[in-house]
Amino acid sequence: MEIIKRGLLFFLIVSLSACSSFMDAKPEGNTLKELKSFYVIDVDRGLKESTLPDGKVLYVAPVRVTSQFRHKSLVYKVGDNAFQPQPGHQFFDSPEEIFTTQLQRWLVKTGIFSNVITDNKHSADLVLETAVTSLYGVKIEGQRPQSVIEMQFFITDRHLVEDAVIFQTGLSIDIDIVETTPPNVVKGWQTGFKKLLATLEDDLSGYFHDNTPQ
């Protein structure tokens, strides 16, 4: 179901790890000699909004991806706490690079911030740290095929004591797909990621509107 869920947050000070097991990879296809397929997640917000007159500079830190999903191979969930990589089906870039680029590109168009950057952290007012904690396709007998994505977001203000966290949220979404195949799973992730970014934008817009001096 395409329902965005909000979950508990865990600070990124703790390194992202996983207790889930990985099964031996059985790549889809008839032979390991088959050419690999490469995928990207690409979302577009559309037109850029007018920038808020007192918007701040936001630094987007490199997105962190929890250990079992940070490699280029797509991953299926095939059982309780069991995941299986698909070596013949990979992201074109690392998930960290893909999500960082897409997140920055979306946020710069929201107009909430005067600028959204991915370098020169020290010139920014705010720092956004993001974690991808789930990124898999569901392929379990008796369960509906789905693309699952879960993300956590934290914004700190560099002008406050100890870079205090001023905004945090956790969002997840399960997108139903016809069949668990690599193209379907990636398309589901793309749909889900766009919905998560739209929800994040609404939350950020509300927060900064309510906390902007009138």
What are these regions (language model features)?
Residues 82-89, 159-201:
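Short secondary-structure boundary motifs at beta->alpha junctions and helix caps
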Residues 20-96, 207-214:
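A structural "domain/chain start" motif
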Residues 57-62, 75, 127-133, 148-154, ...:
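Soluble periplasmic/extracytoplasmic beta-strand elements of cell-envelope proteins
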Residues 1-21:
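Sec-dependent bacterial lipoprotein signal peptides
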Residues 88-112:
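N-terminal leader/targeting helix
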